[in-house]
């Protein structure tokens, strides 16, 4: 190996190490639950954390069905505890997996582990926020027989995860002022959704307020409070789940 080639390889290796290190540091700067969420939910005592899963169980009743939720990029699972607990209180088991490097796209098959949280549950929904929804749709595309339906929070299906031939239903909830998952993106990708898709727009809502972790770069400022947006999410999810449960 001549000296010039060796020098080029060394430079490329250094650049690769620097890039990998920078990417790792970027993934560690996560979006954590706000003080408001910690006032609304006692995560340590009200949420079970086991085998890399955050589990929200119904109280004094057997779960009707299960909901597996994939977080948005770099968002801590507990940032969704408010709405997840409310959905659990209504009778549905909610499981939020921890993702590799906090990126759901690196853990598309985490649903397999999540289902082990309660082997007695026979029917599962898969859901996701933003990029978490993209990862969830990739799982649904490959395992349509394992899920009863899907829920998007500020997310959408793309041609790469075309679900237009899927026989399960989809609930798509999005914010009017979402600067990341815009209405243009949602409308432009509707053809990739299942025929049985329900759309619900939260007036004044944005992307970040599908969790409770504070503002996010690229998003627009919401015109409703974080709790008000979450309460609408809870209402629509439960209305839809209960309707599907009657089928």
Question: Residue spans of the language-model regions?
Answer:
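Active-site-adjacent alpha-helix of alpha/beta-hydrolase-fold enzymes
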Residues: 174-228
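Conserved alpha/beta-hydrolase
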Residues: 84-104
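Short beta-strand element of the alpha/beta-hydrolase
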Residues: 64-72
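Active-site glycine-rich loops that stabilize anionic/oxyanionic intermediates
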Residues: 71-75, 176-177
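Short beta-strand/loop motif that positions the catalytic acidic residue
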Residues: 166, 172-174
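Gly/Ala-rich beta-loop-alpha elbow adjacent to hydrolase catalytic centers
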Residues: 128-136
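N-terminal membrane-anchoring alpha-helices
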Residues: 1-45
């Amino acid at each position: 190996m001549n000296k010039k080639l060796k020098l080029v390889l060394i430079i490329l290796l250094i650049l690769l190490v620097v890039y990998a290190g920078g990417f790792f540091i970027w993934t560690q700067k996560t979006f954590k639950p706000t003080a408001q969420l910690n006032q609304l939910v006692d995560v340590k005592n009200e949420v079970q954390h086991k085998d890399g899963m955050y589990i929200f169980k119904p109280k004094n009743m057997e779960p009707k069905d299960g909901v597996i939720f994939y977080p948005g990029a770099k968002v801590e699972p507990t940032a969704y505890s408010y709405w997840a607990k409310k959905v659990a209180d209504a009778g549905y088991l909610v499981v939020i997996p921890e993702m590799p490097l906090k990126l759901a796209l690196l853990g598309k098959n985490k649903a397999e582990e999540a289902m082990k949280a309660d082997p007695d549950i026979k029917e599962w929904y898969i859901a996701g926020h933003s990029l978490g929804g993209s990862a969830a749709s990739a799982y649904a595309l490959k395992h349509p027989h394992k899920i009863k339906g899907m829920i998007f929070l500020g997310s959408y299906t793309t041609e790469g995860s075309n679900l237009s031939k899927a026989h399960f239903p989809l609930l798509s909830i999005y914010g009017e002022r979402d600067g990341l998952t815009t209405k243009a993106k949602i409308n432009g990708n509707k053809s990739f959704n299942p025929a049985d898709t329900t759309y619900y727009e939260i007036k004044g809502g944005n992307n970040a307020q599908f969790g409770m972790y504070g503002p996010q770069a690229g998003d627009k400022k919401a015109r409703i409070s974080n709790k008000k947006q979450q309460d609408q999410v809870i209402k629509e999810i439960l209305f839809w789940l209960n309707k599907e449960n009657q089928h």
